[in-house]
Amino acid sequence: MPENGSLADLIELAGGIVGKKKFKAAQFGLPFGGFLTEESLNKPLDFSLFNKNTHRNIIVLSEEDCIISFSKFYIEFLLGKMQQRGYLEYSRVQYEIERTWRVLDRISKGKANMRDIFLLRQLCSTIKDTLHQTHNLVLESIDKFYHEFEEHIEEGNCPAGQCIQLLKFKITDKCIGCTACSRVCPIHCISGELKKKHTIDNTKCTHCGQCVIACPVGAIFEGDHTLQLLRNIATPNKTVVAQIAPAVRVAIGEAFGFEAGENVEKKLVAALKMIGVDYVFDTSWAADLTVMEEATEFQSRLERFYKGDDTVKLPILTSCCPAWIKFFEQNYPDMLDVPSSVKSPMEIFSTVAKDIWGKNLGLTREQISVVAIMPCLAKKYEASRQEFSRGDNYDTDFVLTTRELIKIFKESNIDLKNLEDEEFDSPLGEYSGAGIIFGRTGGVIEAATRTTVEMITGEKLDNIEFHELRGWEGFRSADLKIGHIELRIGIAHGLEEAGKMLDKIRAGEEFYHAIEIMACKGGCIGGGGQPKALKKMEVLKKRAEGLNAIDQELPIRRAHENPSVKEIYDKYLDYPMSRKAHELLHTKYFPKLK
């Protein structure tokens, strides 16, 4: 560092801002430092700023950072240190610090009003005066980035896309007007003329992300929660739990020289542990739990139907895909009692992790941070739904897509090819073949059929591979006859096809006992958060084959035979569809404005 060197010199000496992004601010000093902004960038750095601080450090924020999200992390870090008996002098203002965090949390979730900024000023002024501080980061963040607080509160928008409850897709000025996005949008919520910037109607958008996959220039802003993970890992007294969806393991390897469809789950576990995640579990385990609830619900509806109960709702519709659920809520508000009430595997996992697993370890919900590694951008929207929370503590804290995780690994110089295999943690990492095939089209209904039929007949099936349910048509149907049971099953992947099929059901033109619906081509393997591929159909088929291969190789291929699933019922939930199971694992649907 040269004598009289500037902040810009220091940043350059450290290797610059990742991705050569534009400088926004630099935070100095812990536990309560302040901000240096752009006007200080090329001035000589005043090292006296650090003399009265416990840590002499600088954290540089880029233009893609959210000030509210960072301020919230800063307070969480301080509170974590205090819980570890550090910074004891701050115990005098612990009440004010905790209230500051709660106000910032409200702002980040779109639940605040402008009076909350006034309250923040009062709280932080009390902290500053009581401790005789020169700087207070939250006060300085309000003064220097007031417009950002205002945008969060008054417009319900996080311009950096880091506050998950406020996430919206946006088409940026990179747009070349090629129309690729509008052509793939299944609900026609993207508009614009050729060679002119397009726009997205977020009131109609289902967040499926197919526009993001199609855009050739990366013009669609989808949010970025990579820093959320890294900051949670850095926060003292925070236990970071990752869950990995089935489709991720057969796609993420494509970015590291593996073939599409190659299962790299054990490398993925190793990489997540390497960056500091405390526990790595498998969403496929929760998919098995989903099957148990959904199959029992399906069995109940079938039995009532065959007894002549004309109030029973058929077909039962799968409820794993959040883009499909939002589409359904917007367009079929008169049919909200038709889908299964079972939560998605992601939300079931997060609920169990916080309310059962964490409790057994003596952890509160607030001490656990659940990050879901998903192939799907709509999962970010799902995680933000109020029904998947307890008060202001959401079951899934945030979602990273496959592409976001690739970004973290690349920036951390982690190459999956060079890692030793590591196993998932127990007990929420043990899954059956039924759970793994949730990641491809037809997989959810096939997994449920394996269990439903055996529940009804009481007999073990000789063949559990229902090839009639597999295929690549946008909508397909199959008539299954197994013993005395006859089932008419439908499968749709793509919201346009789903809409056509539901219109026929609503009009009484078609009848099915059960239908699986996924928003994306191929199901989750083709999700909007997956690696982009030039030969899309070829890659999708390889990913699907990869999941089928895992299923075939597993010793347990039926969800109801998973011993860790049996254990959770025996110890905590009693039995599928019990009152306890219904309280934790089921949800409701609501009409949405279009």
Feature locations, PLM:
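Short connector loops at secondary-structure junctions
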Residues: 249, 274-300, 324, 341, ...
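Short helix-loop-beta junction
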Residues: 265-279, 330-332, 410, 452-456
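Redox cofactor-anchoring modules in respiratory/redox and cofactor-processing assemblies
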Residues: 1-164, 363-367, 377-594
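Short beta-strand segments
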Residues: 2, 243-245, 317-320, 371-375, ...
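Divalent-metal (Mg2+/Mn2+/Ca2+)-assisted nucleotide/phosphate chemistry catalytic cores
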Residues: 298-371, 375
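Iron-sulfur cluster-binding cysteine motifs and their immediate structural context
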Residues: 95-102, 157, 162, 167-201, ...
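Flanking helices and flexible, charged tails adjoining ferredoxin-like Fe-S electron-transfer domains
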Residues: 143, 147-167, 204, 212-309, ...
